[in-house]
Structure formats: structure tokens, C-alpha cells
Amino acid sequence: MYYNFEWDPKKDKRNSRKHGVTFEQAATVFQDPRSLSLFDAGHSVKEEDRWITLGLSTTGGLLVVHHTFDELDTETINIRIFSSRKAVKPEIKQYSE
């Protein structure tokens, strides 16, 4: 399976200033075999399913990433990242269990 990542560069800059996490860093959580992806029913709409993934980045930080999944073909999934931040204590506990 191949992952293709995309994001809005302006949102990436705002997110980096606000949360100290770039979307490039956030994309690395999808390499974590222990990452946990949950459907975000509260923010999904009919036209777009949204997801939240909790995982370890390649820099060692535990991150929460808000994104979409879009299957481009049988081999490729497009992931559009629109928010990311460092995990807080309850999320760290959830990841550890």
C-alpha cells in the first residue's frame, strides 16, 4: 500500500506556529505500526469522512493528526492532513494501552 500526502501550505504554516508540528512531521505517524485511526463522526459530512490518527512520529513525538482518507486505486491512498498537534495525557495513556 502506498500513501500519498497532501495539505494546504497556509494551514501547515498556521498549524506549525500554533502547535509546533509541521504536516510533514505529522505524515510520519502513518509509518507507525501501532498507530490508531478513529472515524471522526463529529466532523465528518456526507461528502467527506474525517479521521483522527494517534501515532508516533519518526522524531519520537506522539501526535494527533486530523485528516481524510481517499482511496485513489487499489494500491494508493491519498491522505489530506488539515490539523496536527502533540498528544495530551489521556491520548498518551490510550496509545500506551
For each feature predicted by the language model, list its residue ranges.
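Ribonuclease/tRNase effector modules and their secretory precursors
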Residues: M1-E97
